[in-house]
């Protein structure tokens, strides 16, 4: 692997800063927050904290300043009950937890993680360890499975069968992509841009998160509506915006620990970009994606009053994810530490030294 995106600390050509694109100003969608958001956010933090005895003190501090529950309150502000909001908040908190524990895993370890979690989704009533060759599971369920079983059992108590099927399908895609990412990490390779985009659309966890928009609203869209090309374009556009903007916001922390699963790195590695020109390029892609999303909203067909109402609320949920994630990225300490609100104003990011995040 060419190490050019992570030049030696003493190299005179290593950049020291970059300027963020002003995506917040480009996005004109209204920002809303669920009235039960703060209460539910605290409950989700307490849930994961108390359910994970192996977390280090550093990991517990990071959980407290992550504010995944606040992200939920922005992005699922239409949730019809505190109980539904809580399930989604627990899932997003859990999803960040999965991201943290899968970072650095070898391919075989991600296989084990996937089997444990998917077991909970498919056999929710009771832990049923698999015994197939190469897929043997321990008699005692691992903690990621217990957590998944806990929030999923609450979800399916009042969840449409279509939503359940789509959630399990998209979580399967998530783990397949995490496995591919682990394989690239094992082989110390950086993928080409097209391959990266395909994998990143699944490692982001956006697809199951979009399914939970339906759950939060208490709806179950018909398959022919979900599969319509315009609906698919709206889903993918939202995924791309959230994912690509996250590559910009998370780049500083990731470069400090040598993480290459980022579009900025690929543009620098294979397409001759400087750090700033790569950031600008991805920022322009994000702006175009917001514009295309607005155009696709106007192209939605009609399926009759009842379905049209469900579709309108669902698309509003995608829109809430776009604007909510942009604002939340400066509120959480995951990307910019305690400087997020200041960086949101001046958009100037000073690069962390290498290995600082470890």
From Swiss-Prot:
InterPro entries linked: Isoprenoid_synthase_dom_sf, Terpene_cyclase-like_2
Q: What is its cofactor? A: Mg(2+)
Residue positions binding Mg(2+) 2: 99
What enzyme class is recorded for this protein?
lyase
User: In which residues is Mg(2+) 3 bound?
Assistant: 246, 250, 254
Q: Which UniProt keywords apply?
A: Lyase, Magnesium, Metal-binding
Q: Enumerate the Pfam families for this protein.
A: Terpene_syn_C_2 (PF19086)
Detail the disulphide connectivity of this chain as listed in its UniProt entry.
none
Residues noted as binding Mg(2+) 1 in the record, renumbered to the chain: 99
Supply the EC number(s): 4.2.3.-, 4.2.3.125, 4.2.3.126
Q: Which residues form a coiled coil?
A: none
Identify its protein family: Belongs to the terpene synthase family.
Domain commentary: The DDXXD motif is important for the catalytic activity, presumably through binding to Mg(2+).
Give the protein's function.
Terpene cyclase that catalyzes the cyclization of farnesyl diphosphate (FPP) to various sesquiterpenes, including alpha-muurolene, gamma-muurolene, germacrene, delta-cadinene, delta-cadinol and cubenol.
Kindly provide the name given to this protein in its UniProt entry: Sesquiterpene synthase Agr3
As recorded in Swiss-Prot or TrEMBL, the protein's gene is named: Agr3
